[in-house]
A protein has these predicted regions:
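Conserved RecA-like P-loop NTPase helicase motor core
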Residues: 44, 74, 231-341
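Conserved helicase ATPase core of P-loop NTP-dependent helicases/translocases
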Residues: 21-36, 55, 207-209, 217-226, ...
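Conserved helix-turn-beta segment of the N-terminal RecA-like "Helicase ATP-binding" lobe
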Residues: 1-23
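Interdomain linker/hinge connecting the two RecA-like lobes of the SF2 helicase core
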Residues: 116-216, 220-227
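Post-DEXD/H (motif II) to motif III coupling segment of the RecA-like Helicase ATP-binding lobe
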Residues: 73-133
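Long, largely alpha-helical accessory region at the distal end of helicase-like NTP-driven motors
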Residues: 318-380
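Conserved helix/coil segment N-terminal to the catalytic DExD/H
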Residues: 22-65, 76-81
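Walker B catalytic acidic pair
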Residues: 69-70
Length: 380
C-alpha cells in the first residue's frame, strides 16, 4: 500500500482481505470503467480472498490488468479458482514459477499467463546491481546411527507406498515423505554445529537470520546460544504482530540474530540481513532461492552477504539409503553455490564430501533435477 502511494501518488486503492471489508459493497463500482477514467485505481487483494467466487463475481473485468506476486502460489488447488478472472493483461511475478512436484499446478499457471517474458532476469544478472554478491559455506552434519535406522525404516515404507501407487501421490505417501524429511531437518548434531558456527563467525552489529525447522528446535538453539553468552531473538508467525514489529525494529537498529522458521521465506523483507545460517531446509528449490534472495537484498553499507548451510550426511558410506539423502543435500548446495564469490573453493569442499560417500559430484551436477533426485529417494 505504502509503495503504491509512494510511486503513484494519485492512485486510489481499494484494499481487500486482512480485515478490510468495505470492498464487498464497493468493488463493483470501484472497478467500473466510468470511475476508472477519473484516476488510477488499484485493487490490492490477498490471494485467499481474491480467489473466492464472491470477489470474482463483483470484479469488473473489462480493461483489467491482473498482477500476481509470488505467482507460484496461484497454482495450488486451494487458489486455482483465481484463474476465472478473465483479464486482458496478465503479469505473474516469481523467481520460481514452476511448482515443486506439481505438474498440474505448474501447467495451470503457464496456461493462464501463457508466456515467460524474455530475456529471463536471473540471479547472475542481478548480482552487483539489485543484489549484493555473496560467500557460501557448507558444513557437514552427521546423522546418528539411530537417525540413520529411522531414515532407512521410513524409506522402506515409502518404497512400498510408491510401488503400490505408482506415480500417484496419495496423502499417505506424501505424509511418509514429510515424516522422513523431518529426521534430517531435526538431526541432533545440527544444534551443536550451528552453535559453533556462530561462536566462530558472529560479530556484534552483524545481522544474522537462522532458519529452523520448528519452534522446539528454535528454542533448543536459543538456549544453546544463551549458554555460550550469545543473545538471539525469535521470529515466527504465531507471535503477536506488535512483538514481531518490536523484534524487527531492534534488529534494524542494533543488529543481532533472528531465529526464524518459515516466516521469512515469503512476505517479510529485511534488506539489512547480511548473514544467513540454514539449519533446516526443504528440497524444494523455491525455498533456497527465496532464502538466498532475502539475504542478498541491497542495503546501506552492505558490501556482501554470507550464507552458511548445514549438509546432512550419514556416519559412514555403508548406511544404506541415507547416502541418497546426501546426494540431494549436495545438489541443493551446488545450486546455492552457483555465482558465489567463493564458488570454486566451496565446490572443492563438495567434491571431497561426495567422494567420501562414493558419489560423483559431476554426475549430481549434470542431473541437476530435484524431481529426479526425489525419485532416487523414493525408489532406492
Amino acid at each position: 500500500y505504502e509503495e503504491l502511494k509512494k510511486y503513484i501518488p494519485m492512485v486510489k486503492i481499494l484494499q481487500v482481505g486482512q480485515g478490510a471489508s468495505a470492498w464487498k459493497d464497493n468493488l463493483s463500482s470501484f472497478t467500473s470503467l466510468t470511475n476508472a477514467a477519473s484516476s488510477p485505481r488499484v485493487v490490492l487483494a490477498i490471494l485467499n480472498t481474491a480467489s473466492k467466487d464472491n470477489f470474482i463475481e463483483k470484479l469488473n473485468q473489462e480493461n483489467l490488468i491482473f498482477v500476481a506476486d509470488e505467482v507460484h502460489r496461484l497454482g495450488s488447488k486451494k487458489f486455482r479458482n483465481i484463474f476465472k478472472i478473465d483479464a486482458d493483461y496478465r503479469l505473474g511475478l516469481s523467481a520460481t514459477p514452476e511448482r515443486f512436484r506439481d505438474e498440474e499446478g505448474t501447467k495451470a499457471i503457464l496456461d493462464y499467463f501463457e508466456n515467460k517474458l524474455e530475456p529471463i532476469y536471473e540471479i547472475k544478472d542481478a548480482l552487483g546491481k539489485a543484489l549484493v554478491h555473496y560467500d557460501y559455506h557448507v558444513h557437514e552434519c552427521l546423522l546418528s546411527f539411530e537417525e540413520c535406522e529411522q531414515w532407512n525404516d521410513m524409506s522402506e515404507k515409502i518404497s512400498k507406498a510408491w510401488n503400490a501407487n505408482g506415480q500417484e501421490e496419495s496423502d499417505g505417501y506424501v505424509a511418509l515423505l514429510s515424516q522422513r524429511a523431518k529426521i534430517a531437518k531435526k538431526a541432533e548434531s545440527k544444534i551443536s554445529k550451528a552453535t559453533s558456527i556462530l561462536q566462530e563467525n558472529y560479530d556484534e552489529g552483524q545481522r544474522w537470520v537462522v532458519y529452523c525447522e520448528e519452534e522446539v528446535q528454535m528454542e533448543e538453539f536459543r538456549i544453546a546460544l544463551k549458554e555460550e553468552g550469545i543473545d538471539s531473538m525469535k521470529f515466527y508467525s504465531e507471535m503477536p504482530l506488535e512483538a514481531q514489529k518490536g523484534t524487527l525494529e531492534k534488529f534494524e537498529n542494533f543488529g543481532g540474530i533472528i531465529l526464524s522458521i518459515k516466516m521469512l521465506d515469503e512476505g517479510v523483507d529485511i534488506p539489512s540481513i547480511d548473514h544467513a545460517l540454514i539449519i533446516a531446509s526443504d528440497q524444494n528449490p523455491r525455498q533456497y532461492i527465496q532464502r538466498r534472495g532475502r539475504v542478498l537484498r541491497k542495503s546501506d553499507n552492505k558490501q556482501k552477504a554470507v550464507i552458511h548451510d548445514l549438509i546432512i550426511t550419514p556416519p559412514s558410506s555403508e548406511t544404506g539409503k541415507v547416502c541418497n539423502l546426501t546426494k540431494t543435500e549436495i545438489l541443493r548446495a551446488i545450486n546455492f553455490n552457483k555465482n558465489a564469490i567463493n564458488e570454486m573453493q566451496t565446490k572443492n569442499v563438495l567434491d571431497k564430501l561426495a567422494k567420501k560417500y562414493n558419489l560423483d559430484l559431476n554426475q549430481i551436477e549434470e542431473k541437476d533435477d530435484f524431481n529426479n533426485v526425489e525419485e532416487d529417494l523414493t525408489e532406492d
